[in-house]
Regions:
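Tryptophan (W) side chains
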Residues: 3, 17-20
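Catalytic core of IPPT-family isopentenyl/dimethylallyl transferases
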Residues: 10, 20-84, 248-451
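N-terminal phosphate/diphosphate-binding loop that engages ATP/GTP or pyrophosphate donors
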Residues: 52-59, 73-154, 158-197
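Residue-level signal for inorganic ion chemistry
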Residues: 91, 119, 156, 224, ...
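ATP-dependent small-molecule kinase phosphotransfer cores
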Residues: 100, 107-146, 187-239, 306-307, ...
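Long, charge-dense, solvent-exposed interaction surfaces that engage phosphate-rich ligands
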Residues: 158-293, 302, 306-314
């Protein structure tokens, strides 16, 4: 089912449509020459009949997404370079200053090639939400279009992209009384570390999806309970203005759920959305290697995690410290600090394995999420780079050529099948292959983590 959009999200001077005056046939024409002249001039100023009701063409926004490690940043950079575009980051971690390696932030050299936005805009002590991204990204999109450039939104944070295109859901705001009451209701659970009991309370109150929250995400749990206490309904009752995730997943295939045309016709921009994907085993291998590469340099992820601890932050207390990689690295370094800066090779490799596993699981969730976002066209990231870039550029110039060439297409179902191979998947490290390979990391820990 298609939902009607609320008032246009990005309305500016480009989006305003002024209708032409229409002269009704039953009105008598003035008889004076002066008046007749006016009518003739007004009639002459009308556009041809076939153009009078033609809507203004929407501005095009390119969206490039994909699971972690798929190569979306590289693709967005090259497309932006060729189309004179500007990149709007849709990454929930790249917004933070100082979190460079763990967020795979573009280098200074890469950012000098084309303008980048929503990178390094916050301190690590600040929280950032889908609502914040919606506000900021929409503003930047208007600015980019006003400059005559092409907005290219790139990132893998699915909720950010969903809100960006479809708008914010009409979730009720909590009153101060409700917020205070919920805080008191959950306080004893929080102080005693009874996360599971708190989740069960919220589930019993009417939100079983609370069971899916990541452990100790108290902010989101509190917000879910606030919505229930304020409205009597769970957050899922406040659907976004398009087919919800489960409606799309469970419904019989229709034109709307097959190609997203029903939803796209309601949107205020002409979104051309690409999702980069590759065979799951290849993706997992790439993710495992990427995790190793983030740790091989002592000035990399571990150094950034150490800095977060030094400024008084702890794992999982805000958006920055909940981020994959940083959370695991902070927990590992806290353990090392408690042991006087000592760690065995086995402990380091266990931390690495946990980092890799969490990253792969996140990629799996991304694939599941985007498989049900029908506005995206899936492209095989394992194919040669140049044809993919050329396809996107061609589509931008010719909106009728949006079908992905068969040679580049990745079937959504191909990321579901071959489950037997995935069940037997095992990480094979290519950098940290034995005890000696991590000796420089352990030396660095010994020097810097004696706190």
């Amino acid at each position: 089912m298609c939902w009607e959009m609320r008032p246009q999200l990005g309305t500016t001077r480009r989006a305003i449509w002024r209708s032409w005056p229409v002269l009704c046939s039953h009105h008598k024409l003035p008889t004076s020459p002066h008046s007749a002249n006016k009518v003739a001039m007004a009639t002459a100023s009308l556009p041809p009949p076939e153009k009078r009701n033609k809507k203004k063409k929407k501005d095009t926004v390119i969206v490039i997404s994909g699971p972690t490690g798929a190569g979306k940043s590289r693709l967005a950079l090259e497309v932006a370079r060729r189309l004179s575009g500007e990149i709007i980051s849709a990454d929930s971690v790249q917004v933070y200053r100082g979190l460079d390696i763990g967020s795979a932030k573009p280098s200074a050299a890469e950012m000098s090639l084309v303008p980048h936005h929503l990178i390094d805009i916050l301190d690590t002590t600040e929280d950032y939400s889908a609502g914040s991204f919606f506000r900021d990204a929409r503003r930047v999109t208007e600015d980019v279009l006003d400059r005559g450039s092409v907005p290219i939104v790139a990132g893998g944070t699915g909720l950010y992209l969903r809100w960006y295109m479809y708008g914010k859901p009409d979730v009720p705001q909590s009153s101060m009384d409700t917020t205070s009451a919920v805080y008191s209701e959950l306080l004893s659970f929080r102080e005693s570390g009874q996360w599971e009991e708190a989740v069960k309370l919220v589930a019993r109150a009417g939100d079983p999806k609370a069971l899916d929250l990541s452990v100790n995400n108290w902010n989101r749990l509190s917000r879910r309970l606030e919505i229930i206490r304020s409205s009597g309904s769970p957050p899922s009752a406040y659907a976004l203005p398009y087919n919800s995730f489960h409606e799309q997943h469970d419904a019989e295939p229709t034109e709307a759920t097959t190609d997203g045309k029903c939803e796209a016709s309601k949107l205020d921009y002409d979104f051309f959305c690409i999702f980069l994907a590759s065979p799951r085993i290849e993706l997992y291998r790439a993710i495992d290697l990427r995790c190793e590469e983030m740790l091989v340099d002592t000035g990399g992820l571990l150094s950034e995690a150490s800095w977060l601890l030094d400024i008084g932050l702890h794992p999982h207390i805000n958006s920055a410290t909940r981020a994959i990689g940083y959370k695991q690295a902070m927990e590992y370094l806290l353990y090392c600090r408690q042991n006087g800066g000592e760690s065995t090779p086995q402990e380091f490799l266990q931390f690495l394995a946990k980092f890799q596993s969490t990253s792969r699981n996140f990629a799996k969730r991304q694939l599941t999420w985007f498989r049900n976002e029908r506005i995206y066209q899936w492209v095989d990231a394992s194919q040669p780079f140049e044809p993919v870039v050329q396809f996107i550029c061609n589509v931008y110039h010719d909106r009728d050529a949006r079908a992905v060439p068969e040679s580049l297409e990745m079937k959504r179902e191909s990321c579901i099948h071959k489950t037997q191979d995935l069940k037997t998947y095992r990480s094979v490290n290519r950098v940290f292959c034995g005890d000696d390979s991590c000796s420089h990391i352990l030396d660095w820990i010994r020097r810097t983590q004696r706190k």
